[in-house]
Amino acid sequence: MSSGIILLIVAIVLLVIIAYLVGVIIRKRNDSLITSLEERKQALFALPVNDEIEEVKSLHLIGQSQTSFREWNQKWVDLTVNSFADIENHIFEAENLNDTFNFIRAKHEINSVESQLNLVEEDIASIREALNILKEQEEKNSARVTHALDLYEKLQASISENEDNFGSTMPEIDKQMKNIETEFSQFVALNSSGDPVEASEVLDRAEEHTIALGQITEQIPAIVAKLEDDFPDQLDDLETGYRRLLEENYHFPEKNIEARFQEIRESIRANSSELVTLDLDRAREENAHIQERIDSLYEVFEREIAAYKVAAKNSKMLPRYLAHVKRNNEQLKDEIARLSRKYILSETESLTVKAFEKDIKEIEDSTLAVAEQFGLQEKPFSELQVTFERSIKTLTNVESGQMDVFAAVKDIEKIESQARHNLDVYVTQLHMIKRYMEKRHLPGIPQDFLSAFFTTSSQLEALMDELSRGRINIEAVSRLSEVATVAIANLEDLTYQVVQNATLTEQLLQYSNRYRSFEAGVQSSFEHALRLFEVENDYQASFDEISYALETVEPGVTDRFVNSYEKTREHIRF
């Protein structure tokens, strides 16, 4: 056998071996893929879809939800009956083809199974998602229904427990409860008939009406309590108090109190009747108005009770106070009459006392008898309180005025005595001032001093003349005495100033001799000052002239002389 044939045979054998090995490898790979697909199929088939379906089925769905559930359930049945069986057949076919080394057809079957599994996997995911949505939706709807029913049942229980607190509103509340119950029945009917949208709207309305009625029923008892308990109790209290006050001789400026009681009772009945409409804002507003009217009656009674205490106290005080003020006025009249015999008094005091007497007489005529017969009066105590307080205020003003007049006249005699004493002192001082000036031996007396001296003398003479009259004008005496006091003080000051200017001028004129010979200004001022001093007797101008000249040559010299003079100045000995 030739070597060429041998090589050909070896090549064929090698190709067969290689082909066999490749076939074995492909077959094992396909076996692995088929096993993987089988596992995917088993995993999908093992998903708890049946349990989930049974769970949703147990919710007893109705209407559109039930229809949707049936569709998804049928789809699952189709998958389990048809799709899984078909996949199983294709897997079996792929295994046979792979075992017989029909790899191309086997691969085709494997790809087909994989595509089917992908579709089934998607379908199962859709089914499970739809079931979950149905479950959540049903649970949500169930929770809404349960919540709404719980609200209704709680409201029903609350109304039953507090039925007595709703008064005239109970029939309307029962009517509203029946309407809500009807809405729940309507919801069930619509939901069962497959109209979930309309059913949901009805459920919303039922829940809203339940909540609204619950809020209303929470507020009604307080309003009813006012109408059925508080207001009647307050009215009974007012009427009882009113009768008791009438028995105790109370009178009221308001003449329609009985009618006001009746009007309030009618308002209570009317508001109670209107409350059946459940218009709580209006009912509360009317209750507030009723309370205001009741409070106003309380204020009337409390005002009269408080006024009685004040009026009773003032009725006892007024007669005593009136007698006291009247005695004061008589004493004041007597004192003014006594003083009028010696003094000319201002007409103000007499007119004021007459005005006091008029006020006292008016109170005696209009109020005294009322106070003395206080227990028999048929007027409201508030009016009596005002009357007594006005009279007491008048008496207080009268008494205060009496004190002012008394203070004005009580010192008249002291004023006269003091004026006489001052006159004697001032006359003596005038003579002493005159002697003091004479002892100074001045070249002459300044004209302003002479004018002040004679003016003061005239003022003292006027005071002396006024005190010498048969009836002294005490106002004139007071005025003249004050004028004389000021005049004598001014004259004393002027006296000291004149003497000081004259003395210091003499001293400075003498002191200027040391500068006159060589200071022309000092010489000129000396001559001018000397003329003012000896001829014109203007000591102030003379002092100013010479002191100014000396200050120009010897600053401070004037102050030195002034200080020295003030230490040794001779005072007027009064």
From Swiss-Prot:
Biological processes annotated in GO: division septum assembly; septin ring assembly
Spans within the Extracellular topological domain: 1-7
Topological domains, Cytoplasmic: 27-574
InterPro entries noted in UniProt: EzrA
Pfam family, one: EzrA
Localization: Cell membrane
Membrane spanning residue stretches: 8-26
Name this polypeptide is given: Septation ring formation regulator EzrA
Organism: Streptococcus pyogenes serotype M2 (strain MGAS10270)
